[in-house]
C-alpha cells in the first residue's frame, strides 16, 4: 500500500475520534443539566410538601437519575471506542511511516539510477564534443573545412538559447529579441538556421562558441531529445571548470525539475512566474 492509502485511513480515524470526543462532551453537558434539574426539584421540597407531591417529585428525580445513568453508559461506550480507534490510529501511523520510508528509498534509488544514466550520457557527449572540436581545429589548420561545417568568419556568441519549440511564442522569441536589442550576440535557431543547414552541426557550433547557455526549462523541454542533447553538451563544458548553464524555469515546479535532473534543480535559476523578460535581461547583463 502507498502512503496515500494509510494517510486516508489516519484522516478517517482522527475524524472518528474527534466525533466521539464531541459526543462525550455533549453527554457530559446533558449530565450536568440533569443534576441541575435534580437540585431544582430538591429546592421545591419543604416541610409543607404533601406526601402525594413528594412522591411525584421523587419520580421526577428518579427519571433524571435514569437519564444521568444513560449518559454515563454512553460516555463509557464512546471512551471504549476511542481507545480502540486510538490503538488502530497508532498502528496506521507506523504503517504510514514505513510506507513513506519505502517511497523515499525508491525515489532515492530512481534518482541515483537517473544520475548514473545522465553521467554516462554526459561522458558520451563530452567525448563527442572534444572529437568535434579537435576535428574542426585540424581542418581549419589544413584549410579543408567547408563553409557548411564552420561559418566564416568564426562567430562568437554571448548566449546560446536551448529551448523547446512549444515555448517560442510564450517566452523564447521575445527573450532572444530583447537580448539582441541590448547588444548581445545570441545563438537562437530562428536567427541562425537557414534552409539546408545541418541542425546537429549548427547546434554543435553554437554550443562550442557561446560563453553561456540559457536553458529554458519547461514541461515541454524535459520531454525533448534535442534539448537533452544540447543540455548534455553544456554539462560537458562545465565539467572542464567553466560556468556555462544559466537555467530559467518556465511553467514548471521544482519537483518536476528534480525528477528531470537533480543537479540542474540545484542551480540558482530565474523563473518566468516572478521575473519579466526585462528582469531576466538585467540579470544577464550582470554576468
From Swiss-Prot:
It is an enzyme of class 3 (hydrolase). Changing residue 226 to Y: 60% 2-cADPR produced, very little ADPR made. Keywords: Hydrolase, NAD. Residues 155-287 form the TIR domain. Pfam families: TIR_2. The keyword DNA-binding does not apply. The keyword Hydrolase applies. It catalyses: NAD(+) = 2'cADPR + nicotinamide + H(+). Gene3D superfamilies: Toll/interleukin-1 receptor homology (TIR) domain. GO terms for molecular function: hydrolase activity. InterPro entries: TIR_dom, Toll_tir_struct_dom_sf. Its EC number is 3.2.2.-. SMART domains: TIR (SM00255). One of its GO terms (biological process) is signal transduction. Homodimer. This is 2' cyclic ADP-D-ribose synthase BtTIR. It comes from Bacteroides thetaiotaomicron.
